[in-house]
């Protein structure tokens, strides 16, 4: 007999359901997926380089380094951090029902599925995720590849 978590894993692997993760809650000190090297060291290096350039060369060079560093942080590094937090959290919560239950109760996780008839189902902390998984029909279809879900 398969458990609800096993069925959820199958649905997620087949892209028939989506797992939502509250990135900000999970990317904070104290959570098991937080990595301080990802979050503290890069901005620290940017600030040190900016201050050093300001003191040793000129204010404008320090400001340029700070602006370029902030742009790099926002456009390049932050999306990688978000993806890493999502991947680590998904692996952690899908590993055991105990972990899934705990993080579900904390409001970190959500579930979403689009049914073949076009209706959508979502579950958050207030709903029972096990009942949500059990209530999904067995013949849940995926969207054709390349087609985005759109509100009607």
Could you say what each language-model-derived stretch is?
Residues 31-59, 118, 123-142:
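Short, amphipathic alpha-helical segments
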Residues 1-37:
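Cytosolic juxtamembrane N-terminal segments of multi-pass membrane proteins
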Residues 39-88:
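Transmembrane alpha-helical hairpins and terminal membrane-anchor modules
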Residues 8, 51-52, 85, 89-90, ...:
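Generic structural signal of hydrophobic/aromatic residues within well-ordered alpha-helices
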């Amino acid at each position: 007999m398969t458990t609800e978590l096993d069925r959820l894993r199958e649905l997620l692997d087949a892209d028939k359901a989506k797992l939502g993760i509250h990135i900000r809650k999970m990317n904070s000190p104290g959570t098991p997926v937080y990595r301080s090297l990802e979050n503290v060291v890069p901005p620290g290096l940017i600030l040190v380089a900016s201050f050093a350039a300001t003191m040793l060369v000129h204010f404008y060079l320090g400001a340029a380094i700070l602006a370029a560093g902030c742009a790099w942080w926002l456009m390049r590094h932050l999306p990688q951090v978000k993806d890493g937090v999502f991947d680590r959290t998904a692996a952690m919560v899908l590993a055991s029902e105990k972990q899934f239950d705990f993080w579900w109760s904390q409001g970190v996780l959500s579930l979403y599925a689009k049914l073949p008839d076009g209706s959508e189902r979502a579950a958050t902390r207030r709903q029972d995720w096990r009942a949500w998984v059990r209530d999904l029909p067995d013949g849940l279809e995926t969207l054709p590849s390349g087609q985005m879900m759109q509100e009607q």
